[in-house]
Amino acid sequence: MMNKITHYFKSLLLLELLGGLWLTLKYTFKPKYTVLYPMEKFPQSPRFRGLHALRRYPNGEERCIACKLCEAVCPALAITIDSAKREDGTRRTTRYDIDLFKCIFCGFCEESCPVDSIVETHILEYHFEKRGENIINKPQLLAIGDRLETEIAERRAADAAFR
């Protein structure tokens, strides 16, 4: 019975509403924590997952063996792979496309790759001006990988204990 009476008085005095208004008033006059984005940037996590890249072996041969595990594991169905057999009997990709509008940057493709071919880089800033530019093809992915290979290798070596 006493519990109902206290609940009645709390509701009558609108204590929950006043508590919420006090919290709003308290944060209204505190300094805001903002970043002026293009000029200032937040520090990135060492495990940040950004734009994709395809890697090569040190001899220049691409690493991808067209096992299609990344295509199978992708929850957003953003990866499309076509493959063909070469003269020596190995499989290689003829087409490797990633639709960045579909991709959710979960990192499953990177985790499932048995030869560390597909990796996600630290690149956060990219834009598209025309229709169809959101689909990154194999030559573009290889170019990104070639340009950032030393940084990718350093990041993977630093993160090796957690893989």
UniProtKB/Swiss-Prot annotation:
<comment type="similarity">
    <text>Belongs to the complex I 23 kDa subunit family.</text>
</comment>
<keyword id="KW-0004">4Fe-4S</keyword>
<dbReference type="GO" id="GO:0048038">
    <property type="term" value="F:quinone binding"/>
</dbReference>
<dbReference type="InterPro" id="IPR017896">
    <property type="entry name" value="4Fe4S_Fe-S-bd"/>
</dbReference>
<protein>
    <recommendedName>
        <fullName>NADH-quinone oxidoreductase subunit I</fullName>
        <ecNumber>7.1.1.-</ecNumber>
    </recommendedName>
</protein>
<feature type="binding site">
    <location>
        <position position="106"/>
    </location>
    <ligand>
        <name>[4Fe-4S] cluster 2</name>
    </ligand>
</feature>
<dbReference type="GO" id="GO:0051539">
    <property type="term" value="F:4 iron, 4 sulfur cluster binding"/>
</dbReference>
<feature type="binding site">
    <location>
        <position position="109"/>
    </location>
    <ligand>
        <name>[4Fe-4S] cluster 2</name>
    </ligand>
</feature>
<feature type="binding site">
    <location>
        <position position="70"/>
    </location>
    <ligand>
        <name>[4Fe-4S] cluster 1</name>
    </ligand>
</feature>
<feature type="binding site">
    <location>
        <position position="64"/>
    </location>
    <ligand>
        <name>[4Fe-4S] cluster 1</name>
    </ligand>
</feature>
<dbReference type="GO" id="GO:0005886">
    <property type="term" value="C:plasma membrane"/>
</dbReference>
<feature type="binding site">
    <location>
        <position position="67"/>
    </location>
    <ligand>
        <name>[4Fe-4S] cluster 1</name>
    </ligand>
</feature>
<keyword id="KW-0472">Membrane</keyword>
<feature type="binding site">
    <location>
        <position position="74"/>
    </location>
    <ligand>
        <name>[4Fe-4S] cluster 2</name>
    </ligand>
</feature>
<comment type="subunit">
    <text>NDH-1 is composed of 14 different subunits. Subunits NuoA, H, J, K, L, M, N constitute the membrane sector of the complex.</text>
</comment>
<dbReference type="Pfam" id="PF12838">
    <property type="entry name" value="Fer4_7"/>
</dbReference>
<keyword id="KW-0411">Iron-sulfur</keyword>
<feature type="binding site">
    <location>
        <position position="103"/>
    </location>
    <ligand>
        <name>[4Fe-4S] cluster 2</name>
    </ligand>
</feature>
<comment type="function">
    <text>NDH-1 shuttles electrons from NADH, via FMN and iron-sulfur (Fe-S) centers, to quinones in the respiratory chain. The immediate electron acceptor for the enzyme in this species is believed to be ubiquinone. Couples the redox reaction to proton translocation (for every two electrons transferred, four hydrogen ions are translocated across the cytoplasmic membrane), and thus conserves the redox energy in a proton gradient.</text>
</comment>
<keyword id="KW-0520">NAD</keyword>
<feature type="domain" description="4Fe-4S ferredoxin-type 2">
    <location>
        <begin position="94"/>
        <end position="123"/>
    </location>
</feature>
<keyword id="KW-0830">Ubiquinone</keyword>
<dbReference type="InterPro" id="IPR010226">
    <property type="entry name" value="NADH_quinone_OxRdtase_chainI"/>
</dbReference>
<keyword id="KW-1278">Translocase</keyword>
<keyword id="KW-0677">Repeat</keyword>
<keyword id="KW-0479">Metal-binding</keyword>
<keyword id="KW-1003">Cell membrane</keyword>
<feature type="domain" description="4Fe-4S ferredoxin-type 1">
    <location>
        <begin position="54"/>
        <end position="84"/>
    </location>
</feature>
<dbReference type="GO" id="GO:0005506">
    <property type="term" value="F:iron ion binding"/>
</dbReference>
<dbReference type="InterPro" id="IPR017900">
    <property type="entry name" value="4Fe4S_Fe_S_CS"/>
</dbReference>
<dbReference type="GO" id="GO:0009060">
    <property type="term" value="P:aerobic respiration"/>
</dbReference>
<keyword id="KW-0408">Iron</keyword>
<keyword id="KW-0874">Quinone</keyword>
<feature type="binding site">
    <location>
        <position position="113"/>
    </location>
    <ligand>
        <name>[4Fe-4S] cluster 1</name>
    </ligand>
</feature>
<keyword id="KW-0997">Cell inner membrane</keyword>
<dbReference type="GO" id="GO:0050136">
    <property type="term" value="F:NADH:ubiquinone reductase (non-electrogenic) activity"/>
</dbReference>
